[in-house]
A protein has these predicted regions:
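Catalytic loop of the DD-peptidase/beta-lactamase superfamily, centered on the K-T-G motif
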Residues: 1-58, 75
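TPR alpha-solenoid repeat register
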Residues: 73, 107, 140-141
């Protein structure tokens, strides 16, 4: 019996670790773990704001295999910044994510939430509309748009 414990708040690393462990046991190749994007960018957000984060993020293009730059990683980073009241930095991260993953309703929803937190109503409406177009069955998005006075 193998027991895997994890203290990462999202919990899915246990599943990934379990799959990787099984692959190793069966002689299959395993991808190397990538570094957490937030560990790199949050200190820059705190010390240099959006310009420092942007420069580091753009530099990652050549080193993307070292850092997890997935849609989920960017969204998680954006919400971490939002919870830290670093709204301009969160908006920048969500914008990068929307640019990299334009077909994701979740990304546009998150960007709308950040704009809304910043009092940018029109931008929030635009983002929520885009999210609603991509996920037309999402009643929550329709409710938010109605709340914002747009339908």
């Amino acid at each position: 019996m193998v027991v895997i414990l994890d203290n990462y708040w999202q919990g899915d690393t246990v599943v990934t670790l379990g799959k990787d462990l099984m692959d190793v046991l069966h002689g299959k190749p395993v991808a190397l773990a990538r570094k957490n994007l937030g560990d790199l960018l949050i200190p820059l957000a705190l010390s240099q704001g959006v310009p420092g984060m942007r420069k580091a993020y753009e530099t990652l293009g050549a080193n993307a295999s070292q850092y997890d730059t997935s849609e989920r990683a960017l969204n998680t980073l954006g919400y971490r910044l939002l919870r830290m009241q670093r709204v301009p930095e969160a908006i920048a991260v969500f914008q990068w994510n929307a640019s990299a993953h334009p077909a994701s309703a979740n990304v546009h929803d998150s960007l709308g939430e950040a704009y809304r937190a910043d009092g940018q109503r029109e931008q929030a409406i635009r983002s929520y509309r885009k999210a609603s177009e991509l996920a037309p069955d999402d009643a929550r998005l329709r409710g938010i748009l109605k709340e914002l006075g747009s339908q």
